[in-house]
Amino acid sequence: GIFEGDRYFDILVEYAKFSPEQIAVRITATNRGGEAAPLNIIPTMWFRNTWSWGQTPLPEPTISAAQGPAGTLCMVADDGETLSDRRIPNSHRLGRRWLIGSTKDAGAEMLFTNNETNAPVVFHPGGTSLSRYTKDGFHRLLCAGEKAAVNPDLTGTKAGLNYSFVVPAGGSVSVLLLF
């Protein structure tokens, strides 16, 4: 079975209210197996896709790379230029939100794509996606090595910080974030 030989990771996610508008997050992964094993931890932020509904698409929110404190990677999400969708009761905007990740103990890279369906994969091979960069972009990059699956311009409606580790047997790694 899946737990045979303890070849799995325990993942602990801790949240602490840092201030009225900020949450500190620590993600700790422990390798329960008897051998070192690779692990990618990808804290992700995305906007719910309501802009492509209906006949007339609405303006899209954006997530982009931003300058953060030394020793961090930073991205900013902003829906301030979007329009409220009347089809959603109590529709609201979040304004600007930042995701800041420490790079002190681990290197990381920012990944960007769009929260759009990969139509040829989901619907049929001749389908056309609404965006060149689709929501499965991180998977396509990490599992198939498809570098063109993520946006090199570091912008999109879905983004993540990719922390790549080789975790020793019985060892742990942690990722520190501020949201």
Language-model segment annotations:
Residues 1-21, 134-161:
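Extended, loop-rich substrate-binding clefts of extracytoplasmic carbohydrate-active enzymes
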Residues 3, 17-18, 31-35, 167-169:
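Hydrophobic beta-strand core residues of beta-sandwich domains
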Residues 9-11, 25, 41-43, 161-163, ...:
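Hydrophobic residues positioned within well-ordered beta-strands of beta-sheet architectures
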Residues 13-17, 29-31, 179:
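Short, structured patches in soluble enzyme cores that scaffold and shape functional sites
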Residues 20-21, 51, 172:
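Intrinsically disordered or highly flexible coil/loop and linker segments, enriched in small
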Residues 24, 29-134:
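Polysaccharide-binding surfaces and accessory modules of carbohydrate-active proteins
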Residues 165-179:
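Short Pro-Gly-centered flexible turn/kink motifs
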